[in-house]
Amino acid sequence: MGRSYNEKDFEYHRHTFHHTHHPLSTHLPPQRFRKRVLSMDRRRKRKRKKKKTSMPPSDVTPTIHEVDEEEAESEIEGQCQAATPTEPSEELPQLSLGSEEDLAADLPLSSFHMESERPASSEETLPSPASMEEKEETQQPPDGGEHKDISNSFSPSPEAASMTTRGWFRRKPVHRLAGAQRTSYDLRERICIGSMTAMETAVYQKVPTDEAEAQMLASADLDDMKSHRFEDNPGVRRHLVKKSSRCQLPRSSNGSPPLSSLKRRKRMDKKTHEVFVELNELIVDKNQEMRWKERARWIKFEEDVEEETDRWGKPHVASLSFRSLLELRRTITHGAIMLDLDQSTLPGIAHLMVETMIISDQIRAEDRANVLRALLLKHSHPNDEKEGLFHRNHSVTSLGSFRHNHNHVHDTSLPLVSQDHEEMHDSKAAEHDKEKSLHPIPAEGHAASRSLKLLAKIPKDAEATVVLVGCVEFLEKPAMAFVRLNESILLESILEVPVPIRFIFVLLGPTQTNVDYHEIGRSFSTLMSDKNFHEVAYFADDRQDLLNGINEFLDCSIVIPPSDVEGKDLLKTVASFQKQMLRKRKERELKKCASTVTGAELETKDVNIEEQEEEDQFDVDPLKRSGIPFGGLIHDIRRRYPRYISDLKDALDTQCIAAVIFIYFAALSPTITFGGLLGEKTQGMMGVSELIISTATVGVLFSLLAGQPLLIIGFSGPLLVFEEAFYKFCQAQGFEYLTGRVWIGFWLIFIVLVIVAAEGSFLVRYISPFTQEIFAFLISLIFIYETFSKLIKVFQEHPLMMSYTSAAFKHSDQRGSSVIGEPILNQPNTALLSMVLMMGTFFTAFFLRKLRNSRFLGGKVRRVIGDFGIPISILISVLVDILIPDTYTQKLNVPSGFSVTSPDKRGWFISPFGDKQPFPVWMMGASVIPALLVFILIFMETQITTLIVSKKERRLMKGSGFHLDLLLIVTLGAICPLFGLPWLTAATVRSVTHVNALTVMSKATAPGEKPMIQEVKEQRVTGMCVAILVGLSIVMTDVLRHIPLAVLFGIFLYMGITSLTGIQLYERITLMVTPAKHHPDHVYVTKVKTWRMNMFTVIQLLCIVLLWVVKSTVASLAFPFILIMTVPLRRLILTRIFEERELAALDADEDSPNFDEDGRDEYNEIHMLV
């Protein structure tokens, strides 16, 4: 029966003097006796000269003297001084414990002599095999003298021998004395397995090393020797210390830097990588063969394999059981932790994992081969069977190379970690030898192409984590091992995609236990996908760091009570509660970092601040006033024009070609629509031809000179409203309409120069969503009203009658086109067909837009159809009109070739002093008032569009040009009236669509995660090409003449209604008639009382009513002035009615850009019109 130890034995051992054991470091030789590290050549030469002697077992018990450490050192010094100077003095071998050199090379065997020792005879000597080889190689000298050991430079006298023995005892630990048969100490023999300390089956229990020890030591001494040799006390006193879980690092020599500096340097060299986690479970397939099958994967969210269909499910947030997390923490507490393991092959990793499990008493030594065989089973993934003739490159590794090293006999003469594996650590060439690799990279085939889509979603520098869980029958209790490799390695047969592996987690156990291995594997996989625990896993120094990471994860986790949840609405508060916890967590981290800032960190922070200032030179606020005239303009020019060459080179991309085609149709449709309506409003003074030429000319010049060339210049609804109001004013006052526009243009140049010189673009900050929503809502109502008013006018001109006379058909030709000259009235079916064309165009464009965000067809097909919704709807309506030739419809009035809309009314040049009558002088000066009103409209639309495009979420790197763009648009627009061309502005929806078309989304986006912008093709070529193509459309006059005006009214209706749906004001109006229990969880609903929210909505509606009244009277020109007055209303009056908290919720620009192709809608991102 073996003796069992308890705490009393340990306490007795601590306080007993003759059982005191010093740390290993106290037994090292003094510094002057240590051997210098020699080169490999000199070391080989010395090895040939060495002779090892063996000492026979002594029949007489040797006397071991207990001396103080100071006395022993003084005796050693005296012994060294007594050495004969004629004999070559050799230093003692260096005893650097734990170094790689000592482990790789054989240590010299030092002989020693005891006081009662007699000369050894050949009959009594039992030499070791190593000593026998040495004797065969070494010949005895002719004089019969004894061979001198290299470590002993002289033959000592008995007194000297006693001194030598005592000195040697102080340098060598007493419990390492192995007697005559054991004259060497190999560091590898310190590695022992946990089963060696088992009391019942201990191989070394009370067994001395030689006969001398058996004679001299008592039972207590033998027990103490066993404790020192086979228990976990590496160089410490008898108090229990938990061993670090980090893999044993080689200790450096005296000349190397200290270990603390190495750890610090290693920590600085580390960096975290993106994560890819794969969970494999051990199963038995239909052929009764065991294999690893992939059950789930994590890039950011969890994706599970559906067992019935063997396909991937939708990504979701992993829901974990609290019990599995606690079991995981307990498993890591008692499992094997191997950090910074230096291995490059799966067999090598599996071998060390199994040995560590044996040492930590998790598995028996008899289970070594079974566990190793299980770890090296092949891996399967979903849809592997569907690959046909192209099979995966599985790892079918033979275990024969391991069986000869893993017999079940406890051969203690061999180290548990074989020399082959030690050499594998140092063989760099074998690590990169693809011919000898067990996991070659598969050739390009079906398997590689199948995983290409998933590989594109994983970041390039990602490192994988493999989680292996399963049940096995041969284990008695669960066994766990966690491995962090020193460097990531590519094991192609393990993962579904070729991603280098950095972490491996293994959990095997019997089926009888009440442990759910699958849930524990999911828990650890979710932990590794968590950003904070992922960093902990990279920088962990021991087991406790991992446990602290789990505790921190538990602190930020949410526990849902075990109740039946019916409906998703009951879980809505979980997301908001989670956000609050994460925000508090970040605040705690910031406070902790602020309180632990050291002087060195302050210095590095100063350096980082300087670097950040250098990087943010181009990110200076463009609306910040410099205090000097034209300071903002100069800043825009200095920032943008040096990048002019890159603006041209960046256009050499296929995505720019696709953007040109798309934006051309997106810009042409509104141009034709507004041109036709403008011709209707101005009685042909300006129409489609003028608008096409103006758009092309100004667009090309703006693209070449702009600070933000991604803006699309075009006509807009507010300008159309102003043109109609100014035309009515001139008709009522008897002024020439086109001449008045010329003088407005002159004043526009003066106004814009004053504003740009004063850096007045900063005023756009005061135009809040309160004003934008009023403006957009008013224009949408005007669009809708004008559409139905035109339809009513068609019904009035072509009423529905019971019968029609033959005279009604005399003004129509065979195709239904009108004969120019006199108006055509009372045409049969004209009103009905016009209504059908208008509503058909509207519904076609509207539902094609809805199709883009639906789940039908593929994503790219839906995007193309949705982007070209307006041209498709126009084409369909025109074809319907052509197929009904017997019914008259009013067509678009477009002249042939390069001509004005009404050549009989005007020419290409407009005289500033009047054409048919002199223009009044006082009106020349009074034109400053309408010029100021036009400038308000252009300023608002241009600057708000630039503000939307320049949002940080869009990641535009080349900046914006608030001052430069405003100067160019207003100046070019002021020159246009000299040629009878309309003013232009930055079209909001077209500009946002242009930027979206040039945005390159990152393909490395985890499933379920919001798409991230990789880059935006910021260049000048696409805008210029779009403008040129629009200008070339003037030759399409024969095609444009077939477009009925009713189709344009349908597009007008589409613009009005789609603009309303993206305005928050419209949503709050619907909430006024919606019960409170059905209100959505928006900020302006949850943070503001319902009646106060309704009051804010009513104030906006009153402003809209006032603007509508002004617009409907003779003072319609003043509606831009009334509109701009809503800015001081919001800043001065509403702040006295509402609290700042309420205004922040009601008047906040909370709409962030949506970059998801399936849900992107430009109308929902902006408050302005097309």
From Swiss-Prot:
Keywords: Anion exchange, Antiport, Cell membrane, Ion transport, Membrane, Transmembrane, Transmembrane helix, Transport. Residues 246-259 have a biased composition (Polar residues). It is found in: Cell membrane. It catalyses: hydrogencarbonate(in) + chloride(out) = hydrogencarbonate(out) + chloride(in). One of its GO terms (molecular function) is solute:inorganic anion antiporter activity. The keyword Membrane applies. Residues 657-1170 are annotated as: Membrane (anion exchange). The chain crosses the membrane at residues 657-677, 702-722, 744-764, 774-794, 828-848, 864-884, 919-939, 966-986, 1020-1063, 1104-1124. It is a multi-pass membrane protein. This is Anion exchange protein 3.
